[in-house]
Amino acid sequence: MKNLKNIIVVILLACLLAGCANDQYSIEKNYWKAKKSADSIFNNPHASPPFELERAVKLLDAFSKKYHENDLSVDAQFKIASLYLVKKQYDKGRARLGQIIDVYSDSKLVSSEALFLVGKSYELEDKWGLALNHYKRIIKEYPLTKKGFDVPLYIAQYYKIKYQPDKMNAAYREAAVHYKTLAGKHEDSLIGFSVYNLVARCYMALKEWDKSIDSFNIIIDKYKGKVNLDSIYLNTALIYKNELKNKSGARGMIEKLIEEYPQSKLTNTATDLLKEIDKK
């Protein structure tokens, strides 16, 4: 009798899970239908008539309200905001993004993504000052989100694209200082590892090779035995070899990589690099 009860429980649980799976499938199917109109606008925003935008917004709004507890609900709201942006209705796009930030204020991830799009909307209008203000808000308010990690480098790369080398270099230096501070607060976690890598990237962009090496050495000292360092060893070796013309430094890093990570996908590359160094 006990076994029979257990079997019944298992069957009921399986049915419940199947029902949940079917519900999610149904929601995803409905979302696919709701965003078809939006996708056609994204593919050709200049040719789509106003009524098509209104229809797409209406469908996505209806979906979002009906399934407000589902993760796809917020995705639908982002789709609406993005529709307004590609149609160059920037005020409406920003208004929708503001609503997203208000409704999902507890989610730093969602808020940071919405705030980035607000900044991007100003950038699309060629209002860089306003865009920059929003990007800096992300750095200050949401430093540990993906956008929080990305934005300092994004700002520097903007100046690079605009051929403003002085501002680009200043932005990379500002980013390096920010990342160092952030890494210091989280050096006992993998966040620190990731952010020290960003510090190194800043100095590499600035061609300050010694500082790049210093950043990689900090990573090696602090995270050896905690994470794989094969790519760190290889990047350091390449800087020694190609930029600093330091064969012994390059050889030392390559030998560490081969010794500590014999099964690494980078080992063959490292071995070839070592042969190249020894030829010269």
Give, region by region, the residue ranges found by the protein language model.
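Bacterial N-terminal signal peptides that target proteins for export
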Residues: 1-8
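Acidic, polar-rich low-complexity tracts and alpha-helical solenoid repeat scaffolds
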Residues: 4, 19-280
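Bacterial N-terminal signal peptides
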Residues: 9-16
